[in-house]
Amino acid sequence: MAWATLLLPLLNLYTGSVASYELTQLPSVSVSPGQTARITCSGDVLGENYADWYQQKPGQAPELVIYEDSERYPGIPERFSGSTSGNTTTLTISRVLTEDEADYYCLSGDEDNPS
């Protein structure tokens, strides 16, 4: 049975008096259980600010998975990892389980101006 995750096209905008930030993700990533999933997100703001990753399962609120580029939130399995290089951040899920099926969102911005 194939495992698929649907990533809604993400367009996060912050409009202020000084700047406008935009982050983009691919629409979807599909892998089989046991494989490695890599989900990328890109945007100019990532070169200057941390990236956070959220997981949202159907009917549930989003939950923080990775913060400050690569820090795992307490209780998140070690299979989840994050990295950022230049203007691209990547969420990697190793040894994917069917329970990992969800929407994943990247967010970034400084403390005063999140995007």
From Swiss-Prot:
Pfam families: V-set. It comes from the Eukaryota. Residues 21-115 form the Ig-like domain. Keywords: Adaptive immunity, Cell membrane, Disulfide bond, Glycoprotein, Immunity, Immunoglobulin, Immunoglobulin domain, Membrane, Secreted, Signal. One of its GO terms (biological process) is immune response. Residues 20-41 are annotated as: Framework-1. InterPro entries: Ig-like_dom, Ig-like_dom_sf, Ig-like_fold, Ig_sub, Ig_V-set, IgV_Light_Chain. GO terms for cellular component: extracellular region; immunoglobulin complex; plasma membrane. Residues 51-67 are annotated as: Framework-2. Disulfide bonds join 41-106. Residues 42-50 are annotated as: Complementarity-determining-1. Coiled coil: none annotated. It is found in: Secreted; Cell membrane. Glycans are attached at residue 87. Residues 107-115 are annotated as: Complementarity-determining-3. V region of the variable domain of immunoglobulin light chains that participates in the antigen recognition. Immunoglobulins, also known as antibodies, are membrane-bound or secreted glycoproteins produced by B lymphocytes. In the recognition phase of humoral immunity, the membrane-bound immunoglobulins serve as receptors which, upon binding of a specific antigen, trigger the clonal expansion and differentiation of B lymphocytes into immunoglobulins-secreting plasma cells. This is Immunoglobulin lambda variable 3-22. The lineage of its organism: Eukaryota, Metazoa, Chordata, Craniata, Vertebrata.
